[in-house]
Amino acid sequence: MISGAPSKDSLLPDNRHAADYQQLRERLIQELNLTPQQLHDESNLIQAGLDSIRLMRWLHWFRKNGYRLTLRELYAAPTLAAWNQLMLSRSPENAEEETLPDESSWPNMTESTPFPLTPVQHAYLTGRMPGQTLGGVGCHLYQEFEGHCLTASQLEQAITTLLQRHPMLHIAFRPDGQQVWLPQPYWNGVTVHDLRHNDAESRQAYLDALRQRLSHRLLRVEIGETFDFQLTLLPDNRHRLHVNIDLLIMDASSFTLFFDELNALLAGESLSAIDTRYDFRSYLLHQQKINQPLRDDARAYWLAKASTLPPAPVLPLVCEPATLREVRNTRRRMIVPATRWHAFSNRAGEYGVTPTMALATCFSAVLARWGGLTRLLLNITLFDRQPLHPAVGAMLADFTNILLLDTACDGDTVSNLARKNQLTFTEDWEHRHWSGVELLRELKRQQRYPHGAPVVFTSNLGRSLYSSRAESPLGEPEWGISQTPQVWIDHLAFEHHGEVWLQWDSNDALFPPALVETLFDAYCQLINQLCDDESAWQKPFADMMPASQRAIRERVNATGAPIPEGLLHEGIFRIALQQPQALAVTDMRYQWNYHELTDYARRCAGRLVECGVQPGDNVAITMSKGAGQLVAVLAVLLAGAVYVPVSLDQPAARREKIYADASVRLVLICQHDASAGSDDIPVLAWQQAIEAEPIVNPVVRAPTQPAYIIYTSGSTGTPKGVVISHRGALNTCCDINTRYQVGPHDRVLALSALHFDLSVYDIFGVLRAGGALVMVMENQRRDPHAWCELIQRHQVTLWNSVPALFDMLLTWCEGFADATPENLRAVMLSGDWIGLDLPARYRAFRPQGQFIAMGGATEASIWSNACEIHDVPAHWRSIPYGFPLTNQRYRVVDERGRDCPDWVSGELWIGGIGVAEGYFNDSLRSEQQFLTLPDERWYRTGDLGCYWPDGTIEFLGRRDKQVKVGGYRIELGEIESALSQLAGVKQATVLAIGEKEKTLAAYVVPQSEAFCVTDHRNPALPKAWHTLAGTLPCCAISPEISAEQVADFLQHRLLKLKPGHTAGADPIPLMNSLAIQPRWQAVVERWLAFLVTQRRLKPAAEGYQVCAGEEREDEHPHFSGHDLTLSQILRGARNELSLLNDAQWSPESLAFNHPASAPYIQELATICQQLAQRLQRPVRLLEVGTRTGRAAESLLAQLNAGQIEYVGLEQSQEMLLSARQRLASWPGARLSPWNADTLAAHAHSGDIIWLNNALHRLLPEDPGLLATLQQLAVPGALLYVMEFRQLTPSALLSTLLLTNGQPEALLHNSADWAALFSAAAFNCQHSDEVAGLQRFLVQCPDRQVRRDPRQLQAALAGRLPGWMVPQRIVFLDALPLTANGKIDYQALKRRHTPKAENQAEADLPQGDIEKQVAALWQQLLSTGNVTRETDFFQQGGDSLLATRLTGQLHQAGYEAQLSDLFNHPRLADFAATLRKIDVPVEQPFVHSPEERYQPFALTDVQQAYLVGRQPGFTLGGVGSHFFVEFEIADLDLTRLETVWNRLIARHDMLRAVVLDGQQQVLEQTPPWVIPTHTLHTPEEALRVREKLAHQVLNPEVWPVFDLQVGYVDGMPARLWLCLDNLLLDGLSMQILLAELEHGYRYPQQLLPPLPVTFRDYLQQPSLQSPNPDSLAWWQAQLDDIPPAPALPLRCLPQEVETPRFARLNGALDSTRWHRLKKRAADAHLTPSAVLLSVWSTVLSAWSAQPEFTLNLTLFDRRPLHPQINQILGDFTSLMLLSWHPGESWLHSAQSLQQRLSQNLNHRDVSAIRVMRQLAQRQNVPAVPMPVVFTSALGFEQDNFLARRNLLKPVWGISQTPQVWLDHQVYESEGELRFNWDFVAALFPAGQVERQFEQYCALLNRMAEDESSWQLPLAALVPPVKHAGQCAERPPRVCPEHSQPHIAADESTVSLICDAFREVVGESVTPAENFFEAGATSLNLVQLHVLLQRHEFSTLTLLDLFTHPSPVALADYLAGVATVEKTKRPRPVRRRQRRI
């Protein structure tokens, strides 16, 4: 202040006001650059140049001076006179002092103290993460400046100055969501690119590449890299400056300051000093304190307003933003010259509108026009720099806030719209203190704004963005770009040298081509129009649709042509004269030529006339499908009447309603249809009618008169009749015949019902052309097998149906290799969505066939558009409508009747001569749907569509309550009307749910107990639950953390109270000294009171004086770091909610660690065990409020899968995610969100409801919770409730902060709880308490009433046809309403999102078969309630689970084929394929404990493993070996050794050896002492690994495993585990590792002994021999099995001495894996089939022949015992699977899956046996199949080799004899993980690595790009040239192969036969194959040993496999002997082949 001047407080009010007004006037003159004479009291300040930003600054000035004005008031009257009146009306007495706050009040940034982000900064930081939608970019500006003479040293010096001046340039952004100041900023100086001497071409290329690299740069803000300057030096002293700035550190308003200061420094000027005592951290703390009350008000304001907000801009997209992997933005710029801008802003000011709001209104209007909206939610950027301190004005920081503005875009003049928006803005701006970021988060939580508000408007008018200087040393801004995460289009307006720059930065990849360009052009035209035409402000916005688009519409709709003459039926009678003997129609009963058909029709017409039918009468046809329908139709038309087809398949009452509405004169029926008659209307059977005399003179009608009336569903409950003229229908039929050359050679399969208008073309189109109808009977309408027979028998050439039926045909034919579709030359589909896959699938049968997609409406004569499809482009999202048919037209219209621009969705209108006459006898509905405009008569379809730029029409679905379901058009209103008439329905509404294939869902509010059934308690549930509990286990009652330890922590660590110190009765000074925020006062007072009780402080009356005492040293380890956490919370630097995630201090952890928690959980486990025995099934336990699942994990660890099915329900999505991760390894655990849909899905299912410290927390939020729990429980269920009676000391340091210091208000004693239970009709049977933790056993009521949807469906079926009865019925207490009281349909639809779809109440399985299937699906798929609509594969099923399912169904007495499940994956459809069979009396599982330690036979696979490891075999000399290396921190070797020995004792096969060709379990083995290695370097560890990884374990000596440990200096311990597949298969290894992990983690929890052994399993009679049918099936396949992949090899396999395996491994992250499985399910493929097909695609590209066979490893455990999946053993079987490439990848994959399902049906025949048969068939020694696929998917071991385990996998390898390449796949931690183990020496260097890269790339592509599934294989992986198997090297010829044939003597043959009998125990004839005679591979090993003893010393094991019969072997031995005698060469090392 000036010395001597009076302070404001000393001025009298009048003088005070006068001084303020004078200051206002002077500052306005200066700011607006006016003279005093130019500024009048009535001058419009906005017109004078006052913009939005300056207005906000003036508002701050007014408030700082004590005038409580609002922004709305300043905008309302922007003149000095009006503002003066406002000042006079407000008292200025409460003006704020201009004094600076105390420096210590607002702390500065320091290196050690991070501080919070603003909401916008937080959004930027999280949004930039790569996993976020449109993430992977920062909020980033890249700008180039072009100038002269700037040097790097000048620039660097200036930036260094700014670094010292602005602390925000030192900021780094931490992963925990905070920012921190770095004393040394991250800046490496200016990077210089010297291009002064480059030629022009290379210089430009360099600059382009530099721009490409820098323009979308993601700066490393986490280390403080927030800006960067690079300088390019150019010739002639020119330069280009490249600037990168992350907007986390500065907003656009700070740019001006930044560049101004930088330019000043470069110009040699000095900068004024700034106040360093107050920085951005100070500002944020200051702002938080001042704004807190305003923030609460603002939050309430926005939450109240939220439900009324309009949608965000709805622009056409080509892809979902979440699928876009990279963000690359494009800039568009319009520069408005100063003079034109002056005109624009001046005119805006005249209407009291700022230029900013005028621009925002124009921008919104363009968005609205292309989004079909009248209002939208615009994301407006605010530069919300509050002048809290003088230092703020010169501060560089991000002050950004966002405001979501409800913007009016249409329906008024431009000026009025802008004023309305400005008024809304001023009101919203006053409530900006609850940021738009937070509002958006709330809106997303409500699932209303899935993309947020992705279109942003930013205005920086009134200042330059880059510098306010006229001359800038930096240069002029030229090319630039910005990015903001999650933003689609970002609009920026700013001034530059008097001009205004309007820029759009957009992510064009999201939008259709040229769309953004079109929008920007429209925006520029609006701005130019408002600049040029003053009157435009007083008019609505001019239409923005481009003229070029209108011209294209006119062209494609120019369809006029001559109109066909005559009546609809006349052409058929002309054909009858021309070709009377030609076939006209055939069905199962009749086959008529044209003469017969027309004769019958004439006779029937004659009888109609006799019955009194007059011209124009309506005659109903109600009969089942057949040739008689044609007679009836033609007869009615000949009689001059109108035919009215009325379906027989609907309730009689509805038929009668149609008859009455249509004034039907007579009903034509079929005499076989007993129920077709009418009570009130005459009926006539066509069979009787054709006995009459034919009509003599057919009645002639005008072509414009009606031909037929088709009734469709009506919204009022009454069906509506569409009246179609002869001319309209005839035009369509003739057009289609001409377009597709339909003629006498054609036959059509007439599938459509007569009341479906596709039948009109079948009859009048095909017969008019001389073709014939092949009619299906009523029972064949859904039977593709019958269709194929009819198509083949009658040579059908045309197909005309809804898409679903054609899909059914293709699926059938693909599955059964039926080539029937090749007969169809033309396929016409319409009536519903057409799958993108259908054209290619059809052309796989007939490449040159015509595939025609058509559309239209019954109201427009069958069809109105057609599109012939050749190839389906990858970018298509659906099959389009195409173009209008002849004499027909289309419009796409918005709500105001305007044509929609290209790509914009609107209602489809149809015009032309096909438009119906209207609805019969319903003028009101006719007027609503049929519009007569000056140009044309139009039918409003209610369909949504859009135009493409070339004039193609795309169909997008329905907009009203009329839907298409299964091809039927249904008015939802008719269903709602029928529902409302049912007794017991209070209110109801109906929706069609699903994206394309719709399903009807009814939401019903029932009355009283309507549609109810009563359930009673299961007698197996106990009446007294405490009888199951037993005695509560003993426990220590001392808490983990004592009160004394808590007191120590509070006194010394947190409050820092020293002995003798007096805190004072008022805690505020203490809080101030510790910088504790005022809101924590209640908490601090509670702590002080606690310290008094602990005798650490004296009472408050004595000032809380600290008592004498010393700090204890035995601090609990959980306190480590907790003081820092609490200090940050108390100071406001951290949110207290972070405690919820604290591993030690969350309320959940504190409750879990309470000493009574473990005994209670153990008691609950005991109850579950006892109850499971009583129920003879797993107990269904639902935990409500599961949190992160800590207690659940402890419970599940004490139970097995046969005892519990656990469902955890949790409100918090974050905690739900944590719980899913924690419980991922428990197959019986499922987790769901706590919401209405989940509750409905689990209704009446829980045997036990568990509430662990949750009831007190949930009850206040939901007072009806106890009633809800009743709905979850079965009658008589147990509520197991655990609740604290009082707060524990440790909770003072956690829970207290989360409950506002008053947690006890939520806690109750046992009497209070018992009263609550009793009031809710529960019976509290028992209670207990230990150390303050209470436990209640509460019984639910024994009787419960529930709603039964089937009752309602049955009632509806009496009023509606079957296709109109909703498949889903959802009972609700009330329908949800919007803010304006209407039904909230969006809320209802959200119940059926894909996530909620599985949880919604739906059509329950019906009948015993469906229920049996449903029960098995629930068990196998680990899912909740399945419905009749549930799809096995979409629910997670795969081929493995499918195989298990068929086996279990067989045990239940049903014949089930895998192929049926693949073809019919919907539950109801699959159940219909099952056939009841007589199952032999099931043999009980034989357990032979007395034979447990006796030898038993090896399986075929075990024998192959054993024989194959012999050193002489090709690729032998290795074991079937699995090796894995783990690292483990803080290894407890004793514990590990104990656990391993327990597992040895538990599992017999860990004690097994192989002796004399048999396996045997040892009864006793010595304790395993784990060998240890002390190692000093990682290299030593690697040497140990290498030695162990490739060892061959001796199966004859125990142990046949190896487990060793290595200690490496400074590293975690290493654990090496070797297992042999000879004794353990892959699943056994998963079980073993899971039990090892669990045992080591929980050593006190012992696993129970197993009641069954592997030996028992193998001895079961059902496993002893393969099914004869399977043997025959494989025998029939032998000639069609191709060889193994012919891959390029480095050498022949037999040349590899000892194979050495190498590994490649990879993974598909959980997101992509989930997406890939979802795509697989949608394509009805299992995940394994997809992976096999991807792998085969790669192999096929490298193989010499594209077809080949793979060897599949199956872990084939037959479900012979409930605990079969807990035992170890080698259950492996092998199965061959062939790959045959098809037209596309998808087709190939589907074919592979079809073969897979067939092969699995016959998997009881091993691949080993099949390969032997192949060898015999091909007369070769062996047919190897050395390329192996091993899938462990579906085994629910998500913890297998998981990195989260204590045993963390580091490295692994497997090896198998005779295998070249083994691809293994498994799931772990939500990911797909896979390995390739291969013989390294076998393949050229780098080849397998290249194949692996291709596989990984293709796998990712399949997950990301759905269109790639349709591509040919060569487009995915190009074939490799010269791929072949050692093609350049001739095979070696061994001497034995070239020896002469010498016959053996009979004695040798006899000797071999005798030896065989001795070894095998069976006889063999001389010429009989050893294997066919009963030998195994192991027998041949034994035979080899025996024959060597008989003087055949040169005989090798391979010789027996090469010459596998006595005579062949004897012949060979004779030849060898001869050669030995004559040549006596040096012995040749024999090469062995794989068996």
Swiss-Prot record:
Family matches, as InterPro entries: AA_adenyl_dom, ACP-like_sf, AMP-bd_C_sf, AMP-binding_CS, AMP-dep_synth/lig_dom, ANL_N_sf, CAT-like_dom_sf, Condensatn
A GO molecular function held by the record: ligase activity
UniProt entry keywords in alphabetical sequence: Ligase, Multifunctional enzyme, Phosphopantetheine, Phosphoprotein, Repeat
Description of its domains: Consists of a central region with similarity to the repeat domains of ACVS and GRC2, flanked by two repeat domains, each of which contains 5 direct repeats.
Species whose genome carries this gene: Yersinia enterocolitica serotype O:8 / biotype 1B (strain NCTC 13174 / 8081)
Name recorded for this polypeptide: High-molecular-weight protein 2
Residues recorded as bearing O-(pantetheine 4'-phosphoryl)serine in the entry: S52, S1439, S1977
PROSITE patterns the record matches: AMP_BINDING, CARRIER, PHOSPHOPANTETHEINE
Region (II): 1466-1919
Primary gene name: irp2
